[in-house]
């Protein structure tokens, strides 16, 4: 295991809070901002960045989800359940983003590129450091929770129930490791919403792609797991404290990336691909 690339670094903090909206451009802002930061890092000796972001009542589909045989019926079901579907330009499958879900992107430049697993392990250790109470429950474990939504090898779990999922995006010598963390809210309903999507989008048909048979009970919030009332702000503070324990200096990012031509180009690309 190599040393985390963010230790002893000056971390630039970015936050994007998108309230409930019907504007596609606003829904896609966090994704376009991550892409802008990635491309910025390919050109500049800058970062690392930590980007906190939230969205309200959105189901984020992966490209694979668009291959389902009855996509429109699945999308109609999401809308009937009060969620707006959008598609991210990456692998993985559907995840929910609503009140109580915090997304965190860690973006860094590293000429000696870590393996994919190393980058995932750094994020796991980072989250463990933010929630030391989990040690009394057996710690935060990484393994695939096959009947969760968007299952992956580095699902993070407490007592075998998933609390978070991790994804990666790489470009040249830049890595973006992103995590969605279920902090509070009705996690059971989130699971039911995704299960309903697949039930309506697949209608029992076999496909060459694998989609999960979602068991809503396979996931829970970290608040419920730890028996602590946590807000999104509480978790952000814990993450910042974990960074300082790694010897990091924290500073607010001063560049308004959202008003740069690079961001506008990224946003236009995301909008066109919907």
Describe the predicted segments one by one:
Residues 141-163, 260:
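Beta-rich nucleic-acid/ligand-interaction surfaces
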Residues 113, 160-168:
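Acidic, His- and aromatic-enriched active-site or binding-groove loops in soluble protein domains
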Residues 24, 111-118, 226-229:
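Flexible, glycine/proline-enriched loop segments at strand-loop-helix junctions
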Residues 1-113:
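N-terminal lobe of the biotin/lipoate ligase/transferase fold
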Residues 29, 33, 70, 115-126, ...:
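Short amphipathic alpha-helical segments
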Residues 130, 134-137, 173-274:
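Long, positively charged amphipathic alpha-helical accessory segments at protein N-termini or as interdomain linkers
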Residues 102-146:
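Contiguous, small/hydrophobic- and glycine-enriched helical/loop subdomains that border
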